[in-house]
């Protein structure tokens, strides 16, 4: 992100550093400068006395597993993935049918890879997870046993879901 400021009326500018960004590179008039994030979530940039200051910002974005407040009962013990300001979702086209059977290892490593969906270059996120398996045979009930298998989950930005055909989609999935 780049912006220009006239510095006749001010000597500093406060720029909001979003909580989703793990860091930010700041360049002032083409030179990288160090700026600390304040407790209130802003970085302060001293402006030069020249007429125009050019400020370039590059926010670092890493995928993060988030949880909802426990007061939101519908999402209790579930997690979602964000990267920067984007919310991600899990589609059946990538993860198979019966999305309800998926679980996410919340402490697992998240991997990103560039892909194209609907003509847009995006970051796809891959995560370790599980899929519950069905009971064998046609019986309605059986002896309980651990019926999960490890799987690699694929998440895409929410705004792009349902662009590759109809199917199931979930944002919040159970945590393993």
Question: Could you say what each language-model-derived stretch is?
Answer:
Residues 38, 54, 58-176:
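C-terminal beta-rich recognition modules with glycine/proline-rich loops and embedded aromatic residues
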Residues 9-18:
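Surface-exposed beta-strand/loop patches in extracellular or lumenal glycoproteins
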Residues 1-4:
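Short, small-residue-biased leader/transition segments that mark boundaries at the very start
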Residues 18-21, 60:
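Proline-anchored loop/turn motifs at beta-strand termini and strand-loop-strand connectors
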Residues 49-51:
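Surface-exposed, short loops/turns at beta-strand junctions within beta-sandwich domains
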Residues 12-13, 24, 66, 91:
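Short helix/loop capping segments that flank catalytic or ligand/cofactor-binding pockets
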Residues 15, 26, 55-57:
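Hydrophobic, well-ordered secondary-structure elements that form the walls
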């Amino acid at each position: 992100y780049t912006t220009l400021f006239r510095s006749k009326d001010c000597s500093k500018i406060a720029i909001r550093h979003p909580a989703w960004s793990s860091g930010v590179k700041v360049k002032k008039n083409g030179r990288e400068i160090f700026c600390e994030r304040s407790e209130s979530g802003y970085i302060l940039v001293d402006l030069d006395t020249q007429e125009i200051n050019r400020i370039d910002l590059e926010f670092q974005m890493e995928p993060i597993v988030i949880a909802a407040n426990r007061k939101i009962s519908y999402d209790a013990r579930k997690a979602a993935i964000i990267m920067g300001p984007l919310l991600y979702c899990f589609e059946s086209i990538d993860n198979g049918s019966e999305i309800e059977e998926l679980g996410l290892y919340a402490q697992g490593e998240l991997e990103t890879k560039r892909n194209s969906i609907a003509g847009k270059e995006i970051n796809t996120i891959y995560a370790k997870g599980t899929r519950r398996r069905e009971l064998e045979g046609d019986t309605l009930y059986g002896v309980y046993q651990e019926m999960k298998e490890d799987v690699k989950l694929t998440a895409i930005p929410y705004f792009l879901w349902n662009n590759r055909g109809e199917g199931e989609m979930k944002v919040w999935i159970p945590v393993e």
